[in-house]
Amino acid sequence: EALQVLRDELPNVDVVISSNYSPRLADALTKGKVDAAFLRREESAPELAYELLVKEPLVVVLPSDHRLATLESIRVQDIIGETFLSVSDTAPALRAVIDNYLKRSGINITPDHEADHLAMGMSLIASTRGVGLLPAYAQNFLPSSVTSRPLKGETPTIDLVLGYKKSNESLILKLLLSRLDELVARVSKKPR
């Protein structure tokens, strides 16, 4: 969607797409290697500015044939005693949201496994028959052996933001920021 917004205004703009962990994206923004990035808010980078795109709810991710998959929604207490997978420190913002949610819920779970990225998480869930908490966008990438269910009750969220260096004077960045409301509206209308 962001590319379409830019192409509408600047059909000859050259955009490079890459995928990386939020801390690395924040570092690239800080060093001026990229003008903008979609990432999780990194508190350790005060020279960056963030524009909120969406608050993503966390969902329970589990094997499709898991006993909890028969439920429409899952109480966080239902995961006690299950093999629990969390994210590693490659995603510190997400890890903090998960850990704080469990703590607020009065649940003390030590992860049995930690995943560095989404594909690893899906593989671990399928192979260990464990459960995990991930942002709702992960539902777009689930293999048939893995499903998701919403959390019952208070649902934690994690911000997806557009990050950029405050001192960046790029005209393309300014254009993207000027069309941010349109971008958010387009993304909000898309079904998950």
Segments from the language model and where they lie:
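Residues at or immediately flanking beta-strands
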Residues: 12-16, 108-112, 159-161
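Beta-alpha-beta core module
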Residues: 46-52, 56-57, 71, 78, ...
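Secondary-structure junction motif
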Residues: 84-105, 170-177, 187-191
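Alpha-to-beta junction loops
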Residues: 13, 29-38, 58, 107, ...
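Ligand-binding cleft/hinge of the Venus flytrap
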Residues: 2-11, 95-108
